[in-house]
Structure formats: C-alpha cells, structure tokens
Design a protein with these regions (language model features):
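Active-site-proximal beta-strand elements of phosphoester/diester hydrolases
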Residues: 23-36, 121-123, 148-158, 172, ...
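Metal-dependent active-site segment of extracytoplasmic phospho-/sulfohydrolases and closely related
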Residues: 192
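Structured beta-strand-rich core segments of catalytic domains in phosphoester-bond hydrolases
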Residues: 61-161
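Extracellular carbohydrate recognition
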Residues: 1-13
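A solvent-exposed, charged loop/short amphipathic helix patch at secondary-structure junctions
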Residues: 161-184
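Hydrophobic residues positioned within well-ordered beta-strands of beta-sheet architectures
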Residues: 7, 27, 138-140
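N-terminal, active-site-proximal structural segment of metallo-dependent hydrolase catalytic domains
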Residues: 15-91, 103-106, 187
C-alpha cells in the first residue's frame, strides 16, 4: 500500500453549504482517463452530475480522452475530444472559462470556471534532469467578484515504484517506497 496518510484529523459533516454571495464552490476531481465510461453518452451523465452540485470552479485531473469508449484500447489522436473540447463541454454545465495546465503525457489537469481564468505558469519539468513533474501542473488565477484566487493544480505520480523505473526493477523500487518519494519530490518542487 502506498500514498499519503494524515493522522489525528477528525472529519465531521457540517451540513450542506449554502449558495451565499460570499461562498465559492470548488470541485476537484480525478475523472480518470478523460471519462471514457461516459464518452459514448456524449458526457451527458457527467454534465448532469456537475450541474447537480453547481460548482463555481472545477479542476479535473486526467482530463484528456485517451481510450475508446469504455475500453482500454487507445483512441486515435485525431478522434480525441478532450482536452481540446473542454470549452464546449464546460459550457454545457455553465462554465464559460477553461484552461489546461502544463502536461507532458495523457493526464493533464483542466480548470473550468464561471469566472475568468488566467494561466500564470504551466509546469512540466523540474530543476533536476530526468525528474519531471510526471503529469504536469499549473498555477492558475481566477478573479471572482474582484478578488484574486490562485489555484495550483497537480496530479502526482500514481505508481508505487519511482518515476522512470524499468519493469525489472519496479518491485524493488516499490518496496523502497520510491513512488511515495517521487510524489514528495513533485509536491516540494511545486510548493517551493
């Protein structure tokens, strides 16, 4: 098992957050491989789900279409709807603004919003050769009713073994928790 663990935190339901004029609703979700399970349905289930929660800002991890509908067969690049189609998709749930963060593979993060978005920085590489930010990151600025909000998007390395480790060495790398160490490296680089 790998991942981040936080001890001594109590989580309590405080009830539903109202739609007051000073509240900002943010939805941050990993939609897994560009939501390939809803592609054949024109993303109608996804749009209905987002509308149900009516967020002001959304951040979507893995926001590129990479597989054919509901399969693990690669989608031809020319047939991929996302990430280029985010403006059209976001408009269906009421978001007029979109921005795709830095990405170097098939797993970008996309931010959509009811408010203007400015991309401050797209991040794909770090200051160490051979150690990129595996799925990219971005620093985005959203202006909400005259207030500036900076949002950092990051989708860390997901494997138990370290980034770039060959298949013959992956078990040993996982045993040494190199995947966790790589995630820590990515987070520290982004936050520095």
């Amino acid at each position: 098992m790998h991942g981040f663990y936080v001890d001594n935190i109590e989580v309590r339901a405080l009830g539903e957050m109202g739609r007051g004029s000073d509240n900002l609703r943010v939805l941050y979700w990993n939609i897994q491989n560009g939501m390939w399970s809803d592609q054949a349905n024109n993303y109608n289930n996804f749009v209905a789900w987002v509308k149900k929660y009516d967020p002001d800002i959304c951040v979507w991890c893995e926001s590129a279409t990479i597989y054919k509908d509901n399969t693990n067969s690669a989608q031809a690049s020319s047939a991929r709807f996302l990430p280029d189609g985010w403006a059209a998709l976001a408009a269906r749930y009421g978001h007029a603004y979109t921005a795709v963060g830095g990405w170097r593979d098939n797993y970008p993060q996309t931010i959509t919003s009811k408010y203007p978005i400015e991309t401050l920085l797209k991040i794909t590489d770090s200051d160490q050769a051979g150690k990129p930010v595996s799925h990219g990151a971005a620093i985005q600025r959203v202006t909400v009713k005259g207030r500036t909000i900076n949002i950092v998007t990051l989708h860390t390395w997901p494997q138990a073994y370290g980034f770039g480790v060959g298949s013959a060495d992956q078990a040993a790398s996982a045993a040494n928790k190199e995947g966790d160490k790589y995630r820590e490296f990515e987070i520290k680089y982004i936050c520095a």
